[in-house]
Every structure is written in C-alpha cells, then in structure tokens.
A protein has these predicted regions:
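Bacterial N-terminal signal peptides that target proteins for export
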Residues: 1-9
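Secondary-structure junction/capping motif
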Residues: 2-3, 16, 243
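Bacterial N-terminal signal peptides
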Residues: 8-17
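Domain-scale selection of a single, long terminal region
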Residues: 16-20, 24
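Exposed acidic/polar residues on beta-strands and adjacent loops within beta-sheet cores, strongest
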Residues: 23-243
Length: 243
C-alpha cells in the first residue's frame, strides 16, 4: 500500500470525523424562549378543576423552540439547573359539540383554556417533558419549587385524603408524603391549600391547608438525580411512584 493511499485514508477519516462532530454541534444548538404575556378568556365553566370562582382571565406565554411555537404556558418559570427549567403548561381545548355549526369569522367561541401539567424544558436539547408528580391534582396542588424539589398538597387516587408532598424531579418516590386531612371532592375549601413555604437552613417546608394550622416538616437534602441527556434518543420522562 502506497504512502499516498494511507495518507488519503487518514484524511478521509479525519474529514468524516470532523463532519460528524460539526453536525452534532449544529444539531444541539437550540434557542428556547418564552414569549410575551397575553391575556385570554378563562372561566370555571371551561376549567372546572383549576379555575377559581370569578376568575375570568388567564395570563399565558408561548414556549418557542427555534422560533417554533411548541406549547402555551402559564405562571412563573423556575430554573432547576443552568440549562433546565420548569413551567406549567396550559392547554387549549376544543369545546365544540358535534352538533355545533362553525360561525364564520369566529375562531374562539368553541375553545377553552385549561391549566395543565408541569413541563421540564431543556434549553440545550430543546426537549420538553411532562412531569409526573405523585398525587398531583390540577385543581388542588399549588406547587412551590426549590432547587429540584416540588412541594404541594396532593390528593390520593381514591380522592379521600389530602397529603403534604415533596417530590424530586426524576426521583423514584416522594421525598415526603404525609397525610394532612381527609378530602371531600364534592365539598372542600377553595383553595384547599395555599402554596407551601420553603426555608433553606435547616431545609424545611411549611404547608398551609385551609381551615387548620400550618404544618412544617424538615427535609433531609440530597443530591440531584436529574440526568440532562445530550444524546439523540428520547429521554425517559421523569417519573415518581405514588403510594
């Protein structure tokens, strides 16, 4: 084999390798941004689980990835790491009956907005993942974030018990799950709980269930378990087992 052939082979391999690295770098460049706030009509009739009595306007923002609208969101975003953040999704739901006839020029009459799950958004990969928070209830749970911890009042699957819950993103089970009170889905205060309050040192969370005294719990801090993947494969959605 001539030296020229060997040199050509190495040059080809170097070119292919460089091209692959360049392609990978280009593929991972994403621009993730939240748009400006806008107000949309909102009501308890359209979102019976989450809307407060008398609430008629919802402030929303678009989530853009590379200039493309991916989701609508509501409320404040929380930075979990320097590349990932969480924000609550809002869903635009078709409220038209099969018998309803479209009204020319009216694009909004048969659509309603509903508060949805929390999303984990990765600024590097541009990927958004719905978080599966244990015992999370869209109408009851007001989430208070600290680091990668979510604290909120949760409702058990039987809908008979109200729990104090602290969940860690990507954790396999709740960091805290303590019963606060019995829960009556047909007759309960609105809101059921105010947003919990965090304290850093010592790490402590205080819950505020309606109609009773506040309850505090000390939390033993641990290391983050969130894996921010940079590969091309879809990540397994962060999941937490329920009781």
């Amino acid at each position: 084999v001539s030296k020229t052939a060997v040199f050509s082979a190495f040059a080809l391999l170097a070119t292919l390798s460089s091209g692959s690295l360049t392609h990978a770098a280009e593929r991972k460049k994403h621009i993730v941004a939240l748009g400006a706030l806008k107000s949309v009509p909102y009501s308890k009739a359209g979102d019976p689980a989450s809307a407060a009595t008398g609430e008629d306007v919802l402030k929303i923002r678009a989530l853009f990835v590379d200039g493309v609208l991916k989701e609508w969101t509501t409320g404040d975003a929380h930075d979990v790491t320097d590349r990932s953040f969480v924000v609550r999704r809002v869903i635009r739901l078709n409220d038209a009956l099969p018998s309803d006839k479209p009204i020319p020029g009216d694009k909004a009459s048969h659509w309603v907005w509903q508060r949805g799950p929390w999303l984990l958004v990765d600024r590097v990969s541009g990927r958004e993942t719905a978080l599966r928070l244990p015992d999370y209830d869209t109408g009851v749970s007001q989430v208070s974030w600290f680091r990668d911890y979510a604290a909120y009042c949760g409702v058990t699957p039987s809908r008979k018990s109200l729990y104090a819950v602290v969940a860690q993103i990507a954790g396999r089970k709740p960091v805290l799950a303590k019963k606060l009170a019995a829960f009556d889905p047909e007759n309960h205060p609105d809101p059921v709980c105010a947003a919990p309050d965090w304290q850093r040192e010592p790490l402590r969370i205080t819950f505020h269930p309606a109609g009773t005294d506040a309850v505090s719990y000390d939390i033993v801090p641990g290391s983050a378990v969130l894996v921010e993947d940079t590969g091309d494969e879809d990540e397994t959605p962060p999941a937490t087992s329920t009781k």
